[in-house]
């Protein structure tokens, strides 16, 4: 950080950093709070009331048999019409990171429209994560603040990067990932300019000087602290699942590589669906309503047969920890595989959002299913399957470790690193590369 002209400006900058981090954390909490209450009303209270009114239809995973079709098709209609009427499209997380790293700022002229565009697919049950649209909104807000305070010093322009770090930290409750991703300019090492070969190559992360690291740490602490504090005081908020201790014995070590290969295959299915849905989207052309309603229909079908394929997956992961033994192994495995394919299809067909939370849940569901089949420790299986699925999709073990570091106990982390390296080290088949 260049030395500020006056000590007063330096102090003002540090205060602004802490406030920016706190505001980013508060914005993440508020978004999740609205989303959780909206989902609860739309997917719990209304179908329950309909089931009471029509007992003959009071069945299915949501208490009213045809309900997913009503809501998902309505959601597709609204999402498509909103895009058609406003022209608003949320950037994915890599696009946000690339703009912040390259320009040091993010556009803030349509933040209200972007917020609604990010929220709609989540409310209607989309198997997408909130991280993409929400991070763009927070980066825009931080750019707006930085532009108005830059007269106090050029360093205030860095508030966009600092706010983005704080937002990612609060989103994933993962300080390491929140610190590294904006510096890399990519959430998974596959930025806009990544080609077929570099997609699986090493990313370059220029670590800041010690003074900058302290400043970044203040922003990250402010964001995560505010997010956790609001969650404790008011409730709400999401975050990565936290798993208990893992037992790693001879049986688990025997299954390490096979489980990692299954997770890798699950990650490859993500790319199969991504390529197929991109081709379908291009074939349909500029018809956002048609594409979004087709995506809604696919979501409704999957959600009726496999309910856990819906939604981002962070809440469902906590539920699976307690209930996975009551679900057949085949259903858990199918859920993981189908969800990995459903997420990119929804994104390419207009239900825009992130893919991190859903892909993580795919690995969790897959791991629990394979734990039932193999008899191996469930947390071990979840750690290996989640890390390998994410490694296959992200192609960067460093990013996988940073994202999942706080999810697993020490023994699970070691296995997670090995699985991520295996999955990322196996080259993607050429037809699946961009």
Cite the ranges covered by each PLM segment:
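Alpha-helical transmembrane segments and immediately membrane-proximal extracytoplasmic
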Residues: 1-434
